[in-house]
């Protein structure tokens, strides 16, 4: 009772119809009966209006009405006077209790249980109209008492007969009773469940305890939920009963309304409506006012919030700005303090300040390494425990079940990490399509998935973390940093006995279980006493067995040629013999080395059952049965078949997966790595590689991640950690040798347990040495011409309409050109057509390429002394050309590249390695023939072109330098001088440098002491700062020294060179060994000249029509205002210039050579051909004067007695100071200046002045103002200016009036007056730009005209210069130089003086445009010059016609004279600067 809501308890019994109550009140007369019938009719009508016809109360009301109308008795027989009975006290108490309960329910209050018991008197439901048995007994004839008297209950049967429905509604099942029974059952079950949950055992898992506690609390809240629901339902159902829903006034007697009452009612109604309307309007007004007020408050609130936020933001910004300002002040103060210490030569103080800046970074790095090593220790322990459990599980799985099981690939959702396994995972053959349709999933390695499942099943007990910083507690930051650094400097080696006794370090944690391997086991070697493992190979076997025992995977990274294959075979046989582990073992090798592995297994382990899984589909199908049965020990296959046959091979649970040339897995996302991780399950993995570190450190991480994904899981952490000492951080304060060594020693701890690497020079002492030489080759003239344009991205092609083709990958084409120009078919076609031959072969094929020319000198010497050669190429097309060369020289050779079939490779190796083989040379491609080949019968390796990856070249070298080699190995690397190949070589050396620091300096041979590793690391770091000087192309003697192995061979090679030169000298038509420029096809030369002219035209602003990229050169300018002379100085300079011209003409007549016609830069038409003279050497007097001027600067000392020029003598290298070469585009130092003086590059003093100004400007640009170098550069600039002014303006006694005239000379061509009355530099330059061309023409004609006409020209010259003596001197000097050039250049016949004068003038103009200058003024556009020439000098037209006529000279005449073309002056200077 108490568990049910109050309203349900009251409504549990069906309510009595209202008609029954009325009938009881009206039982004493017909008048009361009529009234009762009328009320019943009203009730029935009201219920019908409300649609309650189906209600049981409606049916009972109708039945009662019928009874009253038919006059049937309404009382049970024997109770006729029941209507007059008085109410009993029990009924009165029940009525009062009902009234009280109704009042409580109306107020929605709780009804007490005793009140409910008094108000509801349950009585059994009457299911029949019959009285109780023996209530009206009857008597039978024999005196027997019967239960009923039939006459007394006749009326009851009569009522049943008069019912309107003959079939009564069956009573059925009492729903109230069933509901009570159901509730009792539920309550019992709830009680039992709560009792069970209270008595749960204490050892259940935590997640089960949590679920039980949640369920128990929910069950306890059932009663509260029921009570709340009952209260809510009471509010909802209060107005839904019949008594409250019907209109109570319907039961009143209708009163007739009078007219007065109607009027009063209408009036009251109107008043009520008006009041309601007023209230509605007032309510709406109040609502609007509240909304408006709320809006105002809302806006005000948020406005205040914004103001508060703005104030807070401003306060925070002010705080950080103040902090930043203070920090910058501190930095500036410290910087000034360091500079002050440096200026005061306080080295100790400067070093202390510098260390203070670097210690923070170093301490951070050391702390990071400690944390990383500690985390790896825990990961290694966890990995070992997991692997132990996996081994136990693998033993329970039968092989047959695994083979029959349908292979499925485990995948994982990237975002959530949820893995799909079992039937939910996709099948092997459907994985590719499934991944395309589900891009959010990725393949997860089976080993890694099993690790995760193991972690979920059982949580390892967490060891309490030890506090690491206890020893530094209570110290300030500075003391703590010093303690960390001191500890790192004094750190003992981890292999020391003291360290082993103190605690288990990182290596001891990994190799906890140790097993000694003393001698070779019996199954290794097949019983042959000659097949014995070397001591270092037994050590390698012991290391691999230790990995097996400790459930780890590793990398056997011995240097190439130390027998990694044999050591791997010894591991397999050891596990089979000692550990009773018969496999299966999966060995994945490159296709080129598969036959070698097969031979080694047959030789060293004949008892091991091996399967070679390769070949066609039928061949592979023949061995599938044996594979499915597991009737083998070792299965050898290649990378391709592993990917192709993953469905078959992935079902086998391999004991060991061995991958040869493991650096194939250096890309973490490559297909091979994904397939091996996703499809294959192996207990142990082993990688074999000779180059564990190739291009980048993440590649080493990829290998470790493939082996141990649970330990090396984050590439970002690994790369960030390792790259600190190597990568450029952008900070000027770099780590010194000691600090770099401290960090690298820490990093070696990570790699040492998983990496074993021994070098041949350490373990194989009887192996002969290997020496590598870089031989620089010269370029032929054809290569130089094409290379110069190819650097701009153009390939000269006469077949193209534009004359050239744009190149996309310029570096690749430059490499091709360095190898051989005939790698471009259009170049070969042009040469073939120009030389009038069907095919270019023989010596011509060698003469066009510098590398072939060098090999033509080297190969005969090696052939004569019995050496055999391996030659490696990057391009197979170059191998085709080299084959033609070998056939021409009749050398026997073999060739192996990517197109060679796998079955043929073994035959080629057998032929070359045969004892009496006459094969001299073996051509191989670096990628196809550089792996796994044994070619130790050769002793010379020639790398024709280098690979970007230096380890590819090292692999190629070790094809000959390996176990079994008896001779000294000589490696020759061919590099084209001043080409892109030098940059490739530099990049390769940098990669090898990283390899040395990380791998080799780690000394992963498991026996080196800490002192040895520290010494080796110091040597490597010290070598970083040493940069080799640029080597020139070696001569024959130098090459012989590189190639010769002994003094005897050197003498033989020298004599062979003498014989070769003698033979070439006796040839009838002797040709130089390299192609010269007059032999280059005319179409290529013409295209080269045209594009050079286009470049000049673009620089000068002329319009050109071409399709070439717009790349402009930097032009040098001429300063015309450098010398302002008086009249006497002017006349003396004119006389000196005339003397110099006469002397130069005499010298040029003796040393005159053939010239080639070139294009004038100042002509509008690119077809105007003029003579271009070769650059002259430095005059001896000028060179002597230059040396005297430089000696003054080089010998100048500062106050401390130090030479200020020492810092500027030699610039630091690009490796030492890379940011300098990013800021300074054109570096300059005194070494470069001295080199130009020695080679005669300075023809005039202005060129040296430009270089000196460049040197000073560079120093002031890069260094800060006030620094020591900056001050020294200012001193050098002042000293040079004094020397230069003395040279240009020698001291002469000058009269005083003359000095006064000089500043008062006006500039007639300047439109802007000078403020001081003296023409400014810009005014003079503007004057020179406007009149330079006209005056040069006039001065040239003055020398060949009669005196009267020459005087007219002189007057015109004075008019144009405005009487400026300096300008007149400048023009006179230019005229003299033009006359000197005219006298030294006599290729065309001298028909008249006008033609010579015009040619000389144009040549002089071209020379003046090429001269360097530091002035900011630039020459006006050529079109303006042309216009001024046409307006001032009408004779220019006749001269131009003669010059244009000269351009029509046919090309055949130029070929007959065979002129020698040279590089332009600017090109030579740019090459020298590079």
UniProtKB/Swiss-Prot annotation:
Annotated phenotype, changing residue 346 to N: In sy598; enhances the multivulval phenotype of let-23(sa62) mutants
Deletion phenotype: RNAi knockdown results in 100% embryonic lethality. When RNAi is restricted to mesodermal cells of the MS, C and D lineages, which include the somatic gonadal precursor cells, results in gonadogenesis defects with increased expression of the head mesodermal cell marker arg-1 in somatic gonadal precursor cells.
Residue ranges constituting the Helicase ATP-binding domain according to the UniProt record: 545-710
GO biological process: chromatin remodeling; gonad development; positive regulation of double-strand break repair; positive regulation of transcription by RNA polymerase II; regulation of G1/S transition of mitotic cell cycle; regulation of mitotic metaphase/anaphase transition; regulation of nucleotide-excision repair
Cell compartment(s), UniProt: Nucleus
EC number, UniProt record: 3.6.4.-
GO cellular component: chromatin; nucleus; SWI/SNF complex
Enzyme's top EC category: hydrolase
Extent of Low complexity compositional bias: 1304-1326
Signal peptide (residue range): none
Keyword Nuclease part of the UniProt annotation: no
Region (Interacts with histone H3): 1207-1270
Segments for region (Disordered): 263-283, 383-427, 442-475, 1098-1119, 1136-1161, 1287-1326, 1382-1474
The Bromo domain, residue ranges: 1177-1287
Entry protein name: SWI/SNF chromatin remodeling complex core catalytic subunit swsn-4
């Amino acid at each position: 009772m108490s568990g049910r809501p109050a309203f349900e308890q009251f409504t549990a019994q069906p309510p009595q119809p209202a008609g029954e109550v009325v009938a009881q009140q009206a039982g004493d007369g017909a008048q009361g009966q009529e009234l009762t019938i009328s009320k019943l009719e009203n009730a029935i009508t009201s219920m019908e209006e409300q649609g309650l016809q189906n209600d049981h109360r409606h049916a009972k009301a109708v039945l009662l009405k019928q009874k009253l109308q038919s006059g049937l008795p309404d009382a049970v027989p024997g109770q006729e006077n029941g209507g007059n009975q008085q109410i009993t006290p029990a009924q009165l108490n029940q009525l009062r209790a009902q009234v009280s309960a109704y009042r409580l329910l109306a107020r929605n209050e709780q009804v007490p249980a005793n009140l409910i018991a008094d108000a509801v008197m349950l009585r059994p439901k009457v299911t029949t109209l019959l009285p109780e048995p023996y209530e009206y007994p009857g008597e039978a004839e024999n005196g027997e008492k019967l239960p009923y008297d039939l006459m007394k209950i006749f009326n009851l049967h009569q009522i049943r007969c008069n019912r309107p429905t003959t079939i009564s509604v069956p009573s059925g099942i009492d729903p109230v009773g069933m509901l009570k029974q159901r509730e009792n059952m539920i309550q019992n079950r709830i009680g039992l469940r709560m009792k069970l949950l209270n008595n749960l055992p204490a050892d259940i898992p935590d997640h089960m305890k949590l679920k039980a506690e949640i369920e128990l609390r929910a069950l306890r809240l059932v009663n509260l939920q029921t009570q709340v629901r009952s209260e809510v339902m009471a509010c909802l159902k209060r107005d839904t009963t019949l008594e409250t829903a019907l209109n109570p006034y319907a039961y009143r007697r209708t009163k007739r309304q009078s007219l007065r009452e109607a009027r009063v009612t209408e009036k009251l109604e109107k008043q009520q409506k008006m009041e309601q309307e007023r209230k509605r309007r007032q309510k709406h007004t109040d609502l609007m006012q509240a909304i408006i007020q709320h809006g105002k408050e809302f806006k005000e609130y948020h406005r205040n919030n914004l103001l508060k936020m703005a104030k807070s933001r401003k306060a925070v910004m002010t705080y950080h700005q103040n902090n930043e300002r203070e920090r910058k002040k501190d930095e500036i103060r410290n910087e000034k303090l360091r500079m002050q210490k440096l200026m005061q030569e306080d080295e100790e103080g400067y070093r202390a300040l510098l260390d203070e800046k670097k210690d923070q970074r170093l301490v951070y790095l050391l702390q990071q390494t400690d944390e990383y090593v500690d985390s790896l220790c825990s990961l290694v322990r966890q990995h070992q425990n997991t692997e132990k459990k996996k081994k136990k599980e693998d033993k329970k799985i039968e092989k047959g079940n695994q083979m029959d099981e349908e292979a499925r690939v485990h995948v994982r959702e990237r975002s959530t990490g949820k893995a799909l396994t079992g039937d939910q995972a996709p099948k092997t053959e459907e994985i590719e399509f499934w991944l395309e349709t589900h891009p959010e999933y990725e393949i997860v390695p089976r080993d890694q998935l099993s690790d995760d499942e193991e972690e979920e099943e059982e949580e390892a007990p967490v060891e309490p973390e030890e506090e690491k910083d206890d020893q530094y507690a209570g110290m300030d930051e500075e003391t703590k940093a010093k303690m960390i650094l001191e500890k790192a400097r004094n750190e003992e080696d981890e292999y020391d006995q003291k360290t082993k006794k103190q605690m288990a370090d990182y290596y001891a944690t990994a190799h906890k279980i140790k097993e000694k391997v003393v001698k070779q086991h019996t199954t290794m070697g097949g019983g042959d006493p000659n097949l014995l493992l070397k001591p270092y190979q037994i050590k390698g076997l012991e290391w691999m067995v230790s990995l097996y025992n400790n459930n780890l995977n590793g990398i056997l990274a011995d240097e190439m040629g130390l027998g990694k294959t044999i050591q791997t075979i010894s591991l397999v046989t050891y596990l089979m013999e000692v550990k009773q582990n018969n496999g299966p073992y999966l060995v994945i090798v490159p296709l080129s080395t598969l036959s070698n592995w097969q031979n080694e297994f047959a030789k060293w382990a004949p008892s091991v059952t091996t399967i070679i899984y390769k070949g066609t589909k039928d061949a592979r199908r023949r061995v599938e049965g044996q594979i499915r049965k597991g009737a083998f020990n070792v299965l050898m296959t290649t990378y391709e078949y592993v990917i192709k046959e993953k469905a078959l091979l992935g079902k086998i649970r391999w004991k060991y997966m061995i991958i040869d040339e493991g650096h194939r897995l250096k890309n973490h996302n490559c297909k091979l790595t994904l397939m091996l991780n996703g499809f294959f399950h192996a207990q142990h993995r082993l990688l074999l590689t000779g180059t564990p570190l190739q291009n980048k450190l993440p590649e080493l991480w990829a290998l470790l991640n493939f082996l141990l994904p649970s330990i090396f899981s984050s590439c970002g952490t690994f790369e960030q950690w390792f790259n600190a000492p190597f990568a450029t951080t952008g900070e000027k304060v770099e780590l010194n040798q000691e600090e770099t060594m401290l960090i690298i020693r820490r990093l070696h701890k990570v790699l040492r347990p998983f990496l074993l690497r021994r070098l041949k020079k350490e373990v194989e002492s009887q192996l002969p040495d290997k020496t590598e030489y870089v031989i620089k080759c010269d370029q032929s003239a054809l290569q130089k011409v094409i290379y110069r344009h190819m650097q701009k991205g153009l390939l000269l092609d006469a077949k193209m309409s534009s004359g050239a083709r744009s190149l996309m990958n310029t570096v690749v084409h430059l490499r091709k050109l360095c190898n051989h120009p005939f790698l471009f078919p259009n170049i070969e076609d042009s040469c073939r057509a120009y030389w009038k031959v069907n095919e270019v072969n023989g010596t011509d094929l060698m003469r066009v390429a510098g590398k072939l020319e060098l090999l033509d000198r080297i190969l005969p010497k090696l052939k004569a002394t019995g050496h055999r050669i391996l030659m490696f190429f990057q391009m197979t097309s170059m191998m085709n050309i080299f084959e033609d060369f070998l056939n021409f020289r009749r050398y026997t050779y073999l060739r192996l590249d990517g197109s060679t079939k796998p079955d043929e490779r073994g035959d080629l190796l057998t032929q070359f390695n045969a004892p009496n083989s006459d094969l001299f040379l073996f051509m191989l491609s670096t990628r196809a023939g550089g792996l796994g080949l044994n070619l130790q019968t050769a002793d010379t390796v020639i790398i024709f072109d280098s690979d970007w990856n230096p380890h590819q070249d090292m692999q190629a070298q070790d094809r000959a330098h390996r176990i079994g080699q008896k001779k000294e190995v000589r490696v020759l690397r061919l590099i084209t001088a001043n080409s892109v190949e030098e940059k490739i070589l530099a990049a390769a050396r940098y990669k090898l440098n990283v390899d040395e620091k990380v791998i080799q300096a780690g000394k992963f041979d498991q026996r080196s002491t800490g002192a040895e590793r520290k010494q080796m690391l110091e040597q490597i770091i010290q070598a970083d700062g040493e940069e080799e000087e640029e080597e020139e192309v070696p001569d024959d003697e130098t090459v012989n020294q590189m190639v010769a192995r002994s003094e005897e061979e050197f003498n033989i090679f020298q004599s062979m060179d003498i014989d070769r030169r003698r033979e070439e000298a006796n040839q009838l038509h002797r040709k130089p060994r390299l192609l010269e420029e007059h032999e280059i096809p005319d179409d290529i030369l013409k295209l080269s000249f045209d594009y050079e002219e286009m470049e000049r035209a673009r620089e000068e602003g002329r319009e050109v029509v071409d399709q070439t990229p717009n790349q402009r050169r930097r032009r040098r300018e001429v300063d015309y205002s450098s010398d302002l002379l008086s009249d006497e100085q002017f006349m003396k300079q004119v006389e000196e210039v005339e003397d110099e011209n006469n002397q130069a003409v005499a010298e040029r007549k003796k040393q005159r050579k053939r010239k080639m016609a070139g294009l004038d830069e100042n002509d509008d038409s690119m077809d105007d051909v003029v003579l271009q003279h070769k650059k002259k050497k430095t005059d001896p007097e000028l060179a002597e004067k230059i040396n005297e001027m430089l000696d003054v600067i080089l010998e100048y000392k500062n106050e401390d007695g130090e030479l200020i020029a020492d810092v500027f003598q030699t610039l630091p290298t690009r490796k030492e100071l890379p940011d300098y070469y990013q800021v300074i585009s054109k570096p300059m130092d005194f070494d470069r200046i001295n080199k130009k003086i020695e080679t005669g590059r300075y023809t005039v003093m202005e060129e040296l002045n430009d270089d000196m100004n460049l040197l000073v400007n560079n120093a002031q640009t890069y260094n800060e103002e006030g620094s020591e170098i900056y001050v020294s550069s200012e001193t050098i600039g002042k000293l040079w200016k004094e020397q230069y002014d003395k040279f240009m303006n020698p001291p002469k006694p000058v009269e005083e009036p003359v000095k006064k005239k000089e500043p008062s000379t006006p500039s007639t061509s300047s439109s802007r007056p000078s403020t001081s009355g003296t023409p400014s530099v810009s005014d003079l330059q503007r004057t020179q730009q406007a009149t330079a061309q006209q005056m040069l023409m006039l001065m040239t004609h003055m020398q060949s005209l009669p005196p009267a006409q020459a005087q007219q020209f002189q007057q015109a010259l004075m008019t144009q210069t405005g009487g400026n003596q300096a300008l007149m001197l400048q023009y006179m000097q230019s005229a003299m130089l033009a006359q000197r050039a005219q006298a030294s250049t006599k290729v065309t016949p001298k028909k008249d003086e006008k033609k010579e004068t015009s040619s000389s003038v144009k040549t002089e103009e071209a020379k003046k445009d090429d001269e360097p200058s530091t002035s900011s003024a630039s020459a006006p556009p050529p079109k303006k010059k042309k216009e001024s020439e046409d307006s001032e000098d009408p004779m220019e037209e006749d001269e131009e016609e003669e010059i244009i006529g000269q351009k029509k000279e046919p090309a055949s005449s130029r070929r007959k004279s065979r002129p020698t073309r040279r590089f332009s002056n600017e090109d030579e200077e740019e090459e020298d600067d590079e």
